[in-house]
Amino acid sequence: KHYNKKANNFKEYSDMNMRYLRISGILQRKGRGMIIVPAKHILAEKLAKSTSNEEPIMVQYKRLCEGAELPTDNMDTAKALLNDLIKQMKGRQILFNINDLPLNTAAEINIARRRLENILSQTDEIQYAKEQCNQWQEIADYMELLIKGGGKRTYDDDNVIEVPKDETPAYLEWILWRASLAIDHMVNKPYEVRGFKLDSDFLPVSAAGGGKGDLYCEFNDFTILTEVTMSTSSRQEAMEGEPVRRHVSD
């Protein structure tokens, strides 16, 4: 009643907080809520147990600024996380090999775990790519939202798609990536096509960095290199045309 700021602040700040949680890789979307990523259950439990303490707030703040310890710095916890991940991957019949890696310290165990997490992530992304040919309507709906400069579309109580207005460049790259996967017949892997990072829900974290093309699609007889821009000015070709030629030559 007496709030003198924009009413949208309540929604926008909550959306940003949810996004930060997803970027952590520990939580993912489920309907309108969030759940713990199955592969990160033990880590989430350890983090939850380690956050409550009686230290003064300034002591906690100083430790965070200097680099707070993580549960995975403990060797027993690191082993438990690695063993849990191995169990999950065997249950899903995903091939892996870490026999060449030493497992004598927490740091070495975490290196092995990150290798497995990368294999698991790539496996999930390949499966996600295979599903895109059946997601053409959602892809088209995202494109319509991008044409409007962002917004939201509600299918039902548990299914809502959204393009944040300040993230349209990242979402344009992302939806063109999905459209390319839907066309299929590419010979390179889906994670080799994109130049941007994804969160655990396969949503874009940010736009692609510099130094290479936004999308790099390899087919049997040809390659398509895509540079994405939301610009509509007369300088659009100057901004994106030159980088494409340079990336092709590289």
Give the predicted meaning of each segment.
Residues 102, 108-109, 115-250:
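Catalytic core segments in nucleotide and nucleic-acid processing enzymes
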Residues 1-2, 19:
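Non-catalytic protein-protein interaction scaffold segments in large eukaryotic complex-forming proteins
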Residues 14-19, 23-92, 110-117:
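Accessory beta->alpha helical hairpin/"wing" motif in late/C-terminal subdomains of nucleic-acid enzymes
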Residues 2-11:
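Short helix-coil junctions and helix-kink-helix linkers
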Residues 9-10, 18, 207-209:
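Short amphipathic alpha-helical surface micro-motifs
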